Each structure stands twice: as structure tokens, then as C-alpha cells.
Amino acid sequence: MHRWSRLLGLLPAAGITVFLFSPGVSAKHAQGSDPGALAELRQAVNVELEASRTDKSIWTYRESNITPEKNAVYTTIETSQGTLRRLIELNGHPLSPQATEVETHRIHNYVSDPAAQAKARKAAQHDDAQATEMTKMLQDAFIWTRGGETEDLLTLNYRPNPDFDPPDMQSRVMGIMAGQMIISKDSHRIRTLRGKLSDDVRIGWGLLGKLDRGGTFDVERRMVGDGRWQITETHVHIGGHALIFHTIGQQEDDVKTEWKPSTAHTLQEAEQQLNAGK
């Protein structure tokens, strides 16, 4: 539910999970890293992994999602059984009565479909497992150095580790990212992760497609209440082309606001609350 284990998994590009690792990847230690920066990274990662394991809090929030195709606003309610969200605005306008009815039926059909819920849970577990494997490899995939520092925040800079041996296309994309991680000094929580493709990524030697150098991502996390940290903003702008005619990549800005603890313990309760607020 927007824990650290999901953080880097939120950066898909062109159908490729930007930070996706195979569990058996072999990587050489990043010899060029600053030992102090590595120590800060390890501490922050350990804190995030522990919080991801123990934090079972559930939330409700308003989500604005902008892509080239649409500008959508949702109300989202988390439960211990899963998450529901209801579309409430589209392209700057409230839903029509007909569209509202479609949303009501869509949500009810999902709540009434155990197979669909099981599929969603399985996908989430798969994403979490991949993200956990990736997290453990951060110190090897990049060279880390200390950047700026304020009273409250520490910035770590990262760049590709030339000794990292990517086993597949997904980790190859990761291998050319460079950027910053900003850590909250008092809690050792990761506040910001941003990066940029430092080179083009050619798929199938460029015959199948290419992701363009300069593509960026920015994931922001904040404390939303009771010491809990959540992803509040995700911005992904990665472009490219597949074959000759098709545009690939991702252009998305997702912002979550109005965080409150969720009082819905089941999907049925979340459905009732979403319907009451429609």
C-alpha cells in the first residue's frame, strides 16, 4: 500500500519495469562509492524494508492522474483486503450520471469477483518481491557519493556502476540511470528518488525500439500522519519509439492528497463509502 517495496516498482516505461531485477543477478561491488554514502544508503534501505514489513496502516486519499490520454481524479480507499478507487472527475469535469453508474457497476463487479481480487493480490505480491530484490542491489548497481546536506535532509548522488553486469533488458535500463536520493536525517526515511536516463536504450539493437536519453522520473514521499510515510507524488517522463510507427515510454504525473486513515476494513465497506461519496 504505497510502502517502500512498491516505490521503485512504480516506474514502468514502454511496458518495461524500469527497475526490475532477477533474483540471481551477479553484480560487483561499486568500488567507486563513498563509504559514508554507502553507510547512509544501507541504513535508509534497512529502515524502509523493516517499515514495509511491519506497517499495516490503511489510508484513504484523493488521487490526480495525468497522462497524454486523460486527466483523471479518483477517490481511493485502502482496506486490509485490498484497495478500491472510484473515478470522480475526468478531464476537468465531474462524471455524468451515466458514467457514474458505470463506475458503480465496475466497483461492485470487482468486489463480487474473488478471482479478480486474487489476481490483484498475486500481482501485488509479485511486484513486492521484485522490488525487494532490487532494493538489496542498490549499492551494487550504482556508484554512490554524498551530495548536499541541510539540517533535516541528506542528498546522495548516484550514477551507473560500470562493473554492474545487467542480465536482461530491464536491469540494463536501470544501469544507465543517474540521479539523487534524498533522505530524512532524523528518521532515515527516503523522501525523494529521482533520476534520468544518461544514454539511449536500444531494444533489439535498435531494430525493435529505443528509449530516449534524458527521460526522467521523480518519486516523492512524505509523512502523512502518525509517523507513516507514503508515496505522495510520482512523475515519469520517458519517451521513445518502437519499430517505426509506435511511440513507447511513459508520460505520467500522479499526485495523492487529502490523506486520512481508512475506516474501511473490507472491500464491501470501502464500496459503501465510495458510493456514499459519489
Residue locations for each model-derived region?
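N-terminal secretory signal peptides that target proteins for export/translocation
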Residues: 1-7
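Bacterial N-terminal signal peptides
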Residues: 10-20
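N-terminal signal peptide c-region/cleavage motif recognized by signal peptidases
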Residues: 22-25
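Structured extracytoplasmic
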Residues: 27-177, 186-191, 196-214, 220-225, ...
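Beta-strand elements of repeat-based all-beta scaffolds
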Residues: 220, 231-233
